[in-house]
Amino acid sequence: MVIKTEGLTKKYAKLTALDSLDLHIKEGEIFGLLGPNGAGKTTLISMLCTILKPTSGKAWVNGFDIVKEPAKVRKSIGIVFQQPSVDDLLTGRENLAMHNLLFGVPRAIRKQRIDEVLSLVNLEKRADDLVNTYSGGMRRRLELARGIMHHPRILFLDEPTLGLDPQTREHIWEYIVELARKESMTVMLTTHYMEEAEQLCDRIAIIDYGKIVVMDSPQTLKNQIIGDVVKLKQMIPDIEPIRQLDYVKNMQEKEGLLYLSIKDASKHLQDLLTHTGPIDFVEVRSGTLNDVFLHYTGREIREAEAEGGFWERVMKK
């Protein structure tokens, strides 16, 4: 395992940001941490990258203890932070050259490495322009280039597409997948975009209030609990007849609407409607990771976002 944690915990005065987390990530995996702001995703990445020290528990990255061997951990990883961290007053090439020096990339191959990553993220033509002239997407691509230029075994990506438009987000992920394949890297990313995790990750962990709620491949999670999702509104609310149906895997009631998880809903829809009584409407769709999140947390991820992040929860204590 290239990443391993045992009982990893981070506490602040009034709140537990990460709660006894056990995690194992294999070499070459693209692993996603999925959850709302304040769930503990950034806290976990910060500890694995040795930026924060755990309150208790242990963790190893590339076989190195994050507390006892932080320098070895840092030398073996790359990271793209949630907030921009490139120097606006330098050119793209100068930012990469400075990173080469900091990570001790041999002088003989520095130029080659810079040219390689600039080509990979399609920034060759803008490499000698100041970063303050770059678009948001270009800056993100530059940060990706910087993160992998020293050939890390693990690449940490903390909300790498946060705030970007959908087209730019798609391009960024194309680069990430290509980088992972070309460099044979393990990628650990955080996101609250469900579709990103579903399309990109070999496995995901849903994290909420500092705990891992469930962990598996996206498809396995959907298959285990969802199937199709039937959303309906009864004219006369009465859920007991529906609750007795053996083909209804899960049922959530929210704001007068029922959300039912049913495998092969088209086969059961006619029978289902004989048990619902009169309805205002019914909708059938394929299940998504948002439905998985709803199943395990009782909230949709956008509702969890609206509750506020970590420090908002601290202030409520």
Residue ranges and their predicted role:
Residues 130-134:
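Conserved ABC ATPase signature
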Residues 57-65, 72-73:
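Conserved ABC transporter NBD signature motif
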Residues 155-158:
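Catalytic Walker B motif of ABC-type/P-loop ATPase nucleotide-binding domains
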Residues 174-263:
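ABC transporter nucleotide-binding domain
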Residues 97, 101, 108-126:
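Conserved ABC ATPase "signature" region
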Residues 151:
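Conserved catalytic motifs of ABC-family nucleotide-binding domains
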